[in-house]
Amino acid sequence: MPKQKTHRASAKRFKRTANGGLKRHHAYTGHRFHGKTKKQRRHLRKAAMVSASDLKRIKQMLSQMR
């Protein structure tokens, strides 16, 4: 049986936290900022946590990552 491998695209996009959660970056941060308020842009800079409904699936993709 072959070994399960880490999904490399996901490994580049998520970071594990000390308590076992996953940090992610916000979407909509590449361009077209003229339609967003300063408050929206400021909040988009901060990292967000992966929601509980997605956590199980993403953790399986990152099963070999420490």
UniProtKB/Swiss-Prot annotation:
Question: Can you quote a single GO CC term?
Answer: cytosolic large ribosomal subunit
GO MF terms listed in the record are:
structural constituent of ribosome
Signal peptide bounds = none
Enumerate the InterPro entries for this protein: Ribosomal_bL35, Ribosomal_bL35-like, Ribosomal_bL35_CS, Ribosomal_bL35_sf
Protein keywords: Ribonucleoprotein, Ribosomal protein
What are the recorded Gene Ontology BP terms?
translation
Q: Where is this region: Disordered?
A: 1-42
Q: Report the HAMAP family cross-referenced here.
A: Ribosomal_bL35 (MF_00514)
Protein known as: Large ribosomal subunit protein bL35
Specify the species: Lactobacillus gasseri (strain ATCC 33323 / DSM 20243 / BCRC 14619 / CIP 102991 / JCM 1131 / KCTC 3163 / NCIMB 11718 / NCTC 13722 / AM63)
Q: What is the gene called?
A: rpmI
